[in-house]
Structures are given as structure tokens and as C-alpha cells.
């Protein structure tokens, strides 16, 4: 399975969310939370746990950049714990899941100084805070699992927390010169653990026929978190290189801008990320379990499946097959049409016939899932289908019936999308008609 292309998710800085406005002190913010935090809860949220779930859902459906709201969730969990000190009523698994998730989420709000000469003491303090948040989150998960063994929601939450911990606590402080002996864990083994826990959640959901747990964007976040992590590893070190080049003369930057993505950062065998970067098993795991996710959604009554979840899973699968098709597609077009390769039998270990068949198969699969991701209210999803059809058409013989049929259908889709968006896709349509 092909590695993902640069730019699917932007390194660890995309995971560490910055506060847009700095408060003078965290203590002051905490003291004012009750009067500042106003959240509209869903209808029917009468009991305290339902209200907590509503608060949690409000955060999930937001931009997830509101530290005040996360602290509000944690304070509500603390209050529920205090009111239940006698243990007369056992708190449900979802309580522990929400509590742990919120504690882990706080790690994303730890300030990271922009100054180059950041004091070592400040770095250590920042790292310490992140570690404390994750330790507390994982401790809460274990408390929940003691009371609710193998609960699917708790297992899913634990898997997601571990993946976030890998990124923020273990990968974020690394440089290209880091060595395995410098950190306390083997990153790939911790990642294996996170994925094994998710697999256990799949098994337990299947045993209990609890497929509804997958009908949720929060659960789907795990696959996105893994995709982000793999993207960070694939492109590790490139961001620093780009930042250095930004300091160069603007004209030089423009001249060299097209070459940035071509730079390959080599990691030594004793680098903490070497195993993940050089293995394709994690990419394949992502693909396999995204398929499983879709299969689990299909086990629900179709009318109960959230359309946005179904479309998102299909979209991700479609895009992954398109990305995998890029190399064989390039090989085919190069060997078939590039005069510089006239007479060449192979490129990247593929003949023109092999590259053509592999590309056609992959893009046909991509089309299947992109059609499943189509949203009648979103012309962008129509254009995704049309562009895949054009790419597939390019892989057939010129003026063949297969090519003409694909181009014709793509043209109809683009015209419809263009009309719906006042000409937003005019360039794509004109390019198709010209060729």
C-alpha cells in the first residue's frame, strides 16, 4: 500500500492547538468558568449524566479549541464524583470515558512558546504538564475498566488517548537527531498497543452486536488520529526545513518552492520513529480497519446510520485508493506518452501494461467509495467523482468507447456542479472540454 502524500495532516503543530488569546493566568480562568460558560444542552437531558453527555457533544461538534469548555466538562465530572462518594450509585462507563477524554484533551492546550531561545526549564514544565494530563486520563480509563470490564466505549477512548499521547508526549519533542535511548518508550510498541486495544473494541462490539458505537464521528476520530500520526512520521523533519527556507529571500523561496515537497528526510535505524516510517503495516492496518468500520455501519439499519459518518468513511477510503494509484498512474502516462522514455520497458518495476491495470483497478475502487461519499448538498463531492472519472478515462486508449463514456459522464457532473456553484469549477470543465 502506498505511503500517503505530503499535506494530509500538518505535523504535530496541527495537533497542538494554540489559544487565540492568552489569559493572564490559568487560575483566573478557572475561577470564572461558572459565570462564563453557557452551553445549550439537548432536549431531554434531564439527569446529570445526560447533561454531561450533552456538554461533551457540544465540545465534539465545535472547533475543539475551547479550553474553557473542556475544563467545564472536567469540573462537572469532579462534581459528580464528589456527589457519589458514598458509592450508592455506580457511575456508568460513559462517565469514565468522557472524563478521561477531557483530561487528555487538556494536553492540546499546553502553551508552546514561539521564541527560538526557549528556556530548557520552560520546555520541561510544558512536557511535564502534558505527561500529567495523559497519566490522569489513562488512570481514569483504568478505573472505568475495573468497574466495566471490556466496555467498548472505554476501550475506544483508551485507544484514542494512547494515539494522542504518542503524538503530543513522545513525538512532539523529537528531532531528526533523536535516539531511541533518549525516550522512555518504544514508540512503535505503544502504537501497537493502541491498535490492539481498538481491535479488542471491535471484537467486543461484534460479540454484543453493539454496532451503534461506530455510528459516531468521535469513534471515527481514532482512524483520523492514526492517519495524522502516520502523516507526521512520513513527513518528520520536513516542517523544520520549510521553516528555515521561509527565512530566505522571497524570490529564492519562489524559485525553489516547487522542490520543497521532494526533500526526503532520512532517519537512522536508532531513531525512535524509524520502525514506523519504514513499515507499511500501519498504513495497511488503517485501510483494513476503515473497511471494517464501513462493514460495521452496514450491519445497522440503513435508516439509522448517520449520513455524515457513512459519507466520511467512504470519502476516506476513496481518497486512500486515489493516493495509492498515483505512482502506477504516473508510470503508465510516462511510459505511454513521454518521448524521453520511448523504448523503455519498465519504470518503478512496472511495465506499461502492469501500471495501466493496477491504476485502473485502484481508481475503479476509489470511484466506488467516492460515489458512496456523494452529498447532494455538496458539489465538491460531485467533483471528486468527476475528477476520478477523468483520471480513469486517461488510463484507457485514446478515443476508446470506455474513455469517451467516462469523459461524457464526468462532463455532465461538472456542468451540474458548475451551475450549482456559479462557475466554481469552470477551469476543470474547460480543461476537460479542451482535451
From Swiss-Prot:
Location, primary (coarse class): nucleus
Region of interest (Disordered), ranges: 1-44, 239-263
Record-linked InterPro entries: Nro1/ETT1
Biased amino acid composition, Acidic residues: 242-263
Highest taxon listed in the record's lineage: Eukaryota
Pfam families reported for this sequence: Nro1 (PF12753)
GO cellular component, one term: nucleus
Location within or outside the cell: Nucleus
Entry keyword set: Nucleus, Transcription, Transcription regulation, Translation regulation
Ranges of compositional bias, category Basic and acidic residues: 18-31
A GO BP entry: regulation of translation
Role noted for this protein: Required for correct translation termination and probably involved in regulation of hypoxic gene expression.
PANTHER family in UniProt: ENHANCER OF TRANSLATION TERMINATION 1
Family label: Belongs to the ETT1 family.
Name of the molecule in the record: Enhancer of translation termination 1
Organism from which the protein derives: Candida tropicalis (strain ATCC MYA-3404 / T1) (Yeast)
Gene name of the encoded protein: ETT1
Amino acid at each position: 500500500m502506498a505511503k500517503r502524500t505530503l499535506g494530509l495532516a500538518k505535523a504535530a503543530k496541527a495537533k497542538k492547538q494554540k489559544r487565540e488569546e492568552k489569559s493572564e493566568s490559568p487560575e483566573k480562568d478557572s475561577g470564572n468558568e461558572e459565570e462564563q460558560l453557557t452551553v445549550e444542552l439537548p432536549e431531554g437531558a434531564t439527569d446529570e449524566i445526560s447533561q454531561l453527555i450533552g456538554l461533551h457533544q457540544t465540545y465534539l461538534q465545535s472547533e475543539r479549541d475551547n479550553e474553557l469548555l473542556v475544563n467545564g466538562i472536567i469540573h462537572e465530572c469532579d462534581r459528580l464524583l464528589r456527589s457519589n462518594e458514598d458509592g450508592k450509585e455506580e457511575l456508568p462507563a460513559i462517565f469514565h470515558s468522557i472524563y478521561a477524554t477531557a483530561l487528555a484533551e487538556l494536553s492540546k492546550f499546553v502553551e508552546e512558546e514561539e521564541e527560538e531561545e526557549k528556556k530548557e526549564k520552560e520546555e520541561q514544565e510544558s512536557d511535564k504538564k502534558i505527561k500529567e494530563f495523559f497519566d490522569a486520563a489513562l488512570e481514569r480509563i483504568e478505573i472505568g475498566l475495573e468497574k466495566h470490564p471490556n466496555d467498548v466505549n472505554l476501550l475506544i477512548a483508551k485507544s484514542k488517548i494512547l494515539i494522542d499521547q504518542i503524538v503530543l508526549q513522545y513525538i512532539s519533542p523529537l528531532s531528526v537527531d533523536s535516539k531511541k535511548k533518549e525516550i522512555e518508550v518504544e514508540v512503535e510498541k505503544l502504537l501497537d498497543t493502541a491498535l490492539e486495544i481498538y481491535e479488542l473494541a471491535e471484537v467486543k462490539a461484534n460479540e454484543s452486536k453493539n454496532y451503534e458505537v461506530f455510528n459516531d464521528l468521535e469513534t471515527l476520530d481514532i482512524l483520523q488520529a492514526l492517519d495524522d500520526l502516520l502523516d507526521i512520521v512520513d513527513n518528520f523533519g520536513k516542517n523544520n526545513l520549510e521553516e528555515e527556507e521561509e527565512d530566505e529571500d522571497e524570490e529564492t523561496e519562489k524559485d525553489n518552492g516547487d522542490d520543497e515537497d521532494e526533500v526526503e528526510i532520512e532517519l537512522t535505524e536508532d531513531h525512535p520513529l524509524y520502525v514506523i516510517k519504514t513499515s507499511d503495516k500501519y498504513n495497511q492496518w488503517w485501510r483494513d480497519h476503515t473497511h471494517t468500520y464501513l462493514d460495521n455501519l452496514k450491519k445497522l439499519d440503513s435508516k439509522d446510520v448517520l449520513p455524515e459518518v457513512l459519507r466520511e468513511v467512504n470519502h476516506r477510503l476513496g481518497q486512500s485508493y486515489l493516493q495509492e494509484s498515483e505512482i502506477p498512474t504516473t508510470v503508465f502516462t510516462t511510459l505511454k506518452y513521454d518521448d524521453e522514455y520511448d523504448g523503455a520497458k519498465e519504470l518503478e518495476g512496472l511495465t506499461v501494461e502492469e501500471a495501466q491495470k493496477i491504476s485502473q483497478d485502484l481508481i475503479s475502487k476509489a470511484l466506488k467509495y467516492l460515489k458512496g461519499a456523494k452529498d447532494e448538498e455538496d458539489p465538491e463531492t460531485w467533483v471528486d467523482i468527476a475528477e476520478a472519472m477523468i483520471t480513469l478515462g486517461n488510463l484507457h486508449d485514446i478515443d476508446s468507447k470506455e474513455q469517451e463514456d467516462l469523459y461524457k459522464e464526468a462532463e455532465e457532473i461538472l456542468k451540474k456542479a458548475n451551475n450549482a456553484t456559479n462557475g466554481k469549477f469552470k477551469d476543470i470543465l474547460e480543461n476537460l472540454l479542451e482535451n
